Amino acid sequence: MGNRGKYVAGGALVLAATVLLLAAGGCVTTPWRTADGRIVTGKIDFQHEETTGRTYHLYIPTNYNPKRRYPLVVTAQGTFPFDEAAGQRNRWVDAAERYGLIVCSPDFDSASGFLSVPKDRPAPPLVHDEKATVAIIKEVRSRYSINPDGIMITGWSGGGFPAHFIGLHHPEIFRCIVGRTANFTENLASDDVALRARHMHVYVFFGESDLPGFAAQNREANFWYTMRGFRNFVIQPQPGGHDPNQIEAARYFLNIVNHWPAIQIDASTTEGPAPLPVTLRALVRDPDSPDGRVDSVLWNLGDNRISSSPEVTHTYEQPGLYNVFLMVKDLDGHQEFKQTWIKVN
C-alpha cells in the first residue's frame, strides 16, 4: 500500500469524520489521526496542548512517512490584526509541501510589535509563550517523526519577539532562530542566557524597503548577537518590503539540516569534586559525510587548555564552573559549535 493509502489528507478526513466543536468559540478541531490510528495530513487546526491548553495549528506534508524524520518549523505570527496563528501556518503550506517540512504555529500572546519588553525582567507574555511552546513541541514530537537536529523557531514581524526569546532560552531544543523582517530588542535575553546559546545558528533578514524601524532593529540584533560571540549569525537585506518570505527561511534552515554537521558532546561526568577527570567525546552526524570524516575538531576545555582530538580526557584540578566549547569543521568548511559545562566542587 502506498503512503497515500496509509495517510489521509486533512480536508478529506474532516468531511468523513466527526469534528469536535469547542465550547469556547465554536472552533473546529481537526483530529490528528483517524479512529484506526492513521496519521492525518494537510492542515490540522485548533490543537490544544494538554498541560497548558494552548491552541496551535499544524501542517503535515501530504506524503508524510513515519519512517522518515522531518524538520520542524515552529513559527510565530505577526501583530494582530495583520496576522494570526492559523494564517501564519497557511503561509508555510507551499514551503512545507515543497521541502517536506512539518509546520507548527502556536497562538502566541507575545507576537506583537507593540509588546513592552522591560530591561530588568522578562515580559509575562513571553514567559507564558515559552512554557506553552516547549510543551507543544513535546506533544508534536510524541505524535510525529521529527528530526531532533532539525528544529527551527522563526517569527515574522511582531513574532520576532517570541522567536528570539524562546530560541535563546532553549538552545537544547532549537538548531536555529530566524527573524523574518522581525522585531528585536536587546532586552529579550541576559548575557548569561546568550552565553549558553552562542553555539546556535541565527539568521535575520529585512526588506530593503521595509516598514520604518525594522532595518534598525535587525541591525541592533546584528550588534547584539555578534558582540556575544554567536559565530553562526547572519544578517541579510532582501529585495522588497515587509515580506514574511517563508521560502528564504526554509532554504536557510534546510541548508543547515542537510549540509552542516550536527554535533553533540558526550561527557563522562559533568559534576564532581576536585580533582575531577572528565572524558569528552565529539559525536558528529554529517549528512554529507556518512563515514563521519571531518576536517578538524577543536576543544576549548574552559581552563585555558585546548585539544584537537575527537576524544580527550582532562583533569580539572580546581573548583569552578568550566565552559567547554567545541568546534567541528566539516570537509566543506562548515563550522558547527556545541558547548557544555563542567562543575567542579
Where are these regions (language model features)?
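Bacterial N-terminal signal peptides
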Residues: 12-23
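Serine-hydrolase catalytic machinery in alpha/beta-hydrolase-like enzymes
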Residues: 49-57, 68-146
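The feature captures the conserved acid-bearing segment of alpha/beta-hydrolase catalytic domains
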Residues: 176, 181-254
